[in-house]
Design a protein with these regions (language model features):
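Conserved non-catalytic scaffold segment of RNase H-like nuclease domains
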Residues: 2-102, 114, 137-143, 151
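Active-site flanking residues adjacent to catalytic metal/cofactor-binding acidic residues
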Residues: 6, 118, 155
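Hydrophobic positions within alpha-helical membrane elements
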Residues: 12-14, 124, 161
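Short, function-defining helix-loop hinge/capping sites that tune catalysis or transport
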Residues: 15-17, 105, 127, 164
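N-terminal cationic-hydrophobic initiation segments that often serve targeting/anchoring roles
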Residues: 79-82, 109, 168
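Acidic, Mg2+-coordinating catalytic module of metal-dependent nucleases/exonucleases
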Residues: 88-95, 100-105, 134-181
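Short hydrophobic/aromatic-enriched beta-strand-loop microsegments
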Residues: 111-118
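Short alpha-helix plus adjacent loop in nuclease-associated cores
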Residues: 118-133
Length: 181
């Protein structure tokens, strides 16, 4: 069984629709041995960046993002990653990320990506029997490392994996077993 941890960043969410500029991910096995190191698929969102995103979140030069393929060109790679055989996807607070994927699929008239996806934020609630907090807080507390202030989707995917791994190490139970399909 492979686990794909992912995170998404958007240029803006104007009119309630996310426009993706970064899909960060890593792949590991169910024992958390990394098979594919953290990677960002950069995407030209073909829209204006929210001023807040430009100032506080954008981790790449805008020119690099604008020179990247549009979502419809990156779609097959993302879909293949998320729907690969024996792969379960995980994110942190993933409702927004899944909404952003659906928004861009609709925007480009592409089929919605149907993947098996679980939320590590909910895993914390199930495994530790308490409400989960923001990723940076859980990362600092459960992993024991200080957050460095970056806002890259590949880094957030790695942090999400490390939080999930800390629960696996504690309970010695595959994390997907906490969830009922």
């Amino acid at each position: 069984m492979n686990y794909l941890f992912f995170d998404i960043e958007c240029a803006n969410c104007y009119n309630g629709k996310g426009k993706i500029y970064s899909f960060g991910y890593l792949i590991c096995d169910h024992n958390f041995k990394i098979k594919t190191p953290p990677c960002d698929i950069l995407i030209n969102p073909d829209c204006k960046f929210d001023p807040y995103v430009k100032k506080n979140i954008l981790a790449y030069p805008k020119e690099v993002i604008k020179a990247s393929p549009k979502f419809n060109e990156a779609y097959e790679e993302i879909k293949q990653l998320m729907t690969a055989k024996n792969t379960i996807c995980f994110g942190y607070g993933i409702d927004n990320d899944l909404h952003f994927l659906a928004d861009d699929c609709k925007r480009y008239s592409l089929e919605k990506i149907q993947a098996r996806v679980y939320d590590v934020q909910k895993l914390i609630a199930l495994a530790l029997d308490r409400p989960a907090r923001k990723l940076v807080i859980e990362y600092t507390e459960l992993v024991g490392e200080e957050e460095k202030g970056t806002h890259k989707s590949d880094v957030d995917a790695l942090r999400t994996m490390l939080v999930a791994k800390s629960i696996f190490v504690k309970d010695n139970k595959p994390i997907h077993k906490y969830f009922k399909d």
